[in-house]
Amino acid sequence: VNATLNMWNRLQPEVDLGMGWAKYCPDDKSFTYRGKLSPYARLGVNYNFLYKSDPAYKVFLGVKCGYSFFNYEITDVAYDNGYWSENGKFDIAGQKSHAVWGEFLVGLNVKLWRNISAGWQAKYHRLFNHKSNANSEPWYIPGFGPRNSNLAVTFNVCYTLPLCKDKWPKK
């Protein structure tokens, strides 16, 4: 869920709240990672470069800070000891973690029909801090995504609540 406040069509403070989860098993089936359904929040601001035009159209740069606390487990971890010719599997269950990250983004929104618009965002995000556990590190962070990628692209379809009855001046 995203809420944006349009301030003079130039600055747009924004809050994102959501839930994320993950399940991942590599091709060699050496383990299964399960991120439990967990909340995340992001808070930031966008600057609209088309502030002199219709508010339904935006080209913007933004910055956000995100936080999530989450649980995960890693099961069926396969190991092979070649020296002793031993192999087996074990689980790492009940792992808890949290993370803080920052994002820089560029985006575009266009009006499709009435109060419905669509757009995309490309963002660079970086972890500032995350809790590592004694036996594992989180692979997936809700709201951030996989830890091994700093770039992301999203596509959005939005509905604008008509809270203000004033019309934008026509030229």
Where do the PLM segments sit?
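Predominantly the C-terminal beta-signal and adjacent terminal strand-loop region
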Residues: F104, V110-K171
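Transmembrane beta-barrel domains of outer membrane proteins
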Residues: N2-T4, N46-N48, G107-N109, C158-T160
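A contiguous pocket-lining binding segment that forms or flanks enzyme active sites
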Residues: W84-K111
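Residues that define the transmembrane beta-barrel architecture of outer-membrane proteins
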Residues: V1, G35-A41, Y57, K96-G102, ...
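Extracellular loop and loop/strand-boundary signature of outer-membrane beta-barrel proteins
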Residues: P26-R34, G88-G94, Y140-G145
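Short, solvent-exposed loop/edge-beta patches enriched in aromatic
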Residues: L5-L11
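Short secondary-structure capping/turn segments at boundaries of alpha-helices and beta-strands
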Residues: V1-T4, K29-F31
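Gram-negative (and chloroplast) outer-membrane scaffold detector with strong preference
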Residues: L11, V15-Y83, Y159
